[in-house]
Amino acid sequence: MQDPRHPQGLPLSPGLPKRQRQDRTIYNWKQQEVLENHFKEEQYPDYDTRQELAEMLNLREYQVQVWFKNRRAKRSRERWFQKQLQQLQKHPQQQHPQQQHPQQQLQQQQPQQQPQQQQPQQQPQQQQPQQQQLHQQPQ
């Protein structure tokens, strides 16, 4: 049996109902402003506070809970990036090996060698006349 919701014809699981995913919640600017202000004061609101916010903003408690969870994750990411930026500003020459160009990594891994001075080689064209002179017999 084919699932009519999937034009590719994915088969249905027999006997088990499909779990419906809730649509993404889009918060208007007023909801965001209120939630952000509460987040500044309390990053982990309890159930009663979330319930009050949900009623005030015409949302479900679960949506408020998810908003706070996502906002804490965003704060964590921002702190991590800020820390990375501060480290780069303190030590601009020191980069994490994965942040370097592969050529830079190779240069750092190889021991520093002094380039050997090579003596210029005579070109074959210059040697040919000398060889011809040696092989020629005087007349």
Swiss-Prot record:
What this chain does, per the record?
Transcription factor required for zygotic genome activation (ZGA), a critical event in early embryonic development during which the developmental control passes from maternally provided mRNAs to the expression of the zygotic genome after fertilization. Protein produced from maternal transcripts that binds and activates expression of key ZGA marker genes, such as NANOGNB, ZSCAN4, DUXB, KLF5 and DPPA3. Binds to regulatory DNA sequences containing a 5'-TAATCC-3' sequence motif.
Task: Give any GO molecular function from the UniProt entry.
Answer: DNA binding
Question: What is the official name of this protein in its record?
Answer: Tetra-peptide repeat homeobox-like protein
Q: Name one GO biological process term.
A: maternal-to-zygotic transition of gene expression
Bias class Low complexity marks the residues at: 82-139
Q: Organism, per UniProt?
A: Homo sapiens
Family statement: Belongs to the paired homeobox family.
Report whether DNA-binding shows up as a keyword of the record.
yes
**The keyword Cytoplasm is annotated on this UniProt entry:** no
The uppermost taxa in this organism's lineage are:
Eukaryota, Metazoa, Chordata, Craniata, Vertebrata
State the encoding gene. Answer: TPRXL
